[in-house]
Design a protein with these regions (language model features):
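N-terminal secretory signal peptides that target proteins for export/translocation
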Residues: 1-3
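Electrostatic cytochrome c docking/interface patches
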Residues: 30-61
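Gly/Gly-Pro-rich "capping" loops immediately C-terminal to redox-active cysteine motifs
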Residues: 52-59, 75-101
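Conserved functional loop/turn residues at catalytic and ligand-binding sites
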Residues: 65, 70-73, 87, 103-104, ...
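Axial heme c-ligation environment in periplasmic c-type cytochrome domains
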Residues: 22-29, 48, 77-84, 101-133
Length: 133
């Protein structure tokens, strides 16, 4: 009888946690958004690439709009992931611009499409400056 109760309890536990585990695996991540960037956005070139003034302006914008979630240096914040990981640093500038523009609301990243396009490129340029030079 004990073994039957143990088997039933185990089966109930498996059934109870399976939906939670499935939801956890399906939760979007910030990095998953990079896999959804359309090709035409991915190949866009940054008009401010290597522009030192754009890096400085992008830093100020980052501090105002991004640092609260991603941390002052991009390493990690209270809510957002590190921006120094290979997934971010090897992504194209066009991909980063697209993610900044469209966000990833399900993963907690706001949409920044209302920021003027030059400012979004400045943030992209600043993010590029955080990686290996």
């Amino acid at each position: 009888m004990r073994s039957v109760i143990a088997v039933v309890a185990f089966a109930w536990l498996v059934l109870a946690i399976s939906p939670a585990m499935a939801r956890e695996k399906q939760e979007p991540t910030f990095y998953s958004q990079l896999g959804h960037v359309p090709e035409e956005a991915r190949i866009r070139l940054n008009p401010l690439e290597r522009d030192s003034d754009a890096v400085l302006a992008g830093r100020k914008l980052y501090e105002r709009h991004c640092a609260e979630c991603h941390g002052a240096t991009g390493e990690n914040g209270r809510k957002g992931p590190s921006l120094l990981v290979p997934e971010i640093q090897t992504a194209s500038s066009g991909s980063l611009f697209w993610v900044i523009t469209n966000g990833n609301v399900r993963a907690g990243m706001p949409v920044w499409s209302k920021l003027p396009e030059p400012q979004r490129w400045q943030i992209t340029t600043y993010l590029r400056s955080l990686g290996p030079q």
